[in-house]
């Protein structure tokens, strides 16, 4: 018979494993010496974009990652680590932790998983500086409308010139 504590740990590992497997974005970060008030501020920022930040015991995180396609992350789970898990958002949690880490030097991005691919801290930093989807669409629409505006302006000038010549 399995002890209740062990059963609870097994349940937690399988729950975390499932969350990691289904997530669009998972970020592992170190937060030693971060005041609780700052950690709660990060938690509130992430909650606004439907993401969660969780602290699990190291062995539970290691076992959960071992049972996924991300076994390479197990060796990085030394020290005090936390996870950001996002089921919907892809870049927003990356931007939040990137900006938070810039403000709080004790927070260090260790690694992550973005769209089922393990990414390094450098790749996470690169992704954080990308414009959002809305900004990209706005830039695309401006780029597509610019030639039309120029054509309309040229046609207007041409019609005004012809009107003054007649």
Curated annotation (Swiss-Prot):
RNA-binding is among the record's keywords: yes
Superkingdom field: Bacteria
SUPFAM superfamilies per UniProt: Ribosomal protein L10-like
Record carries keyword Manganese: no
Gene3D superfamilies: 3.30.70.1730
GO molecular function: large ribosomal subunit rRNA binding
Alphabetized InterPro entries for the sequence: Ribosomal_uL10 (IPR001790), Ribosomal_uL10-like_sf (IPR043141), Ribosomal_uL10_bac (IPR022973), Ribosomal_uL10_bac_type (IPR047865)
Pfam families: Ribosomal_L10 (PF00466)
Record key words, sorted: Ribonucleoprotein, Ribosomal protein, RNA-binding, rRNA-binding
One annotated GO biological process: translation
GO cellular component, as recorded: ribonucleoprotein complex; ribosome
Chain segments annotated as coiled-coil in the UniProt record: none
Membership in a protein family: Belongs to the universal ribosomal protein uL10 family.
PANTHER family documented for this protein: 39S RIBOSOMAL PROTEIN L10, MITOCHONDRIAL (PTHR11560)
Protein's UniProt name: Large ribosomal subunit protein uL10
Organism (species): Phytoplasma australiense
């Amino acid at each position: 018979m399995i002890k209740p504590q062990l059963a609870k740990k097994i349940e937690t590992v399988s729950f975390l494993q499932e969350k990691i497997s289904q997530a669009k974005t998972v970020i592992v970060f170190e937060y030693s010496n971060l005041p609780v008030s700052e950690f709660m501020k990060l938690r509130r920022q992430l909650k606004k974009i439907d993401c969660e930040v969780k602290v699990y015991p190291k062995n539970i995180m290691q076992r959960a990652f071992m049972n996924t396609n991300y076994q390479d992350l197990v060796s990085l789970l030394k020290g005090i680590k936390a996870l950001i898990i996002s089921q919907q958002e892809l870049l927003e949690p990356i931007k939040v932790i990137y900006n938070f880490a810039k403000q709080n030097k004790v927070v260090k991005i260790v690694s992550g998983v973005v769209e089922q691919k393990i990414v390094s801290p450098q790749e996470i930093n690169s992704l954080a500086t990308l414009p959002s989807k809305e900004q990209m669409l706005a830039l695309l629409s401006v780029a597509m409308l610019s030639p039309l505006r120029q054509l309309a302006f040229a046609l207007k000038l041409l019609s005004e010139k012809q009107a003054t010549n007649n």
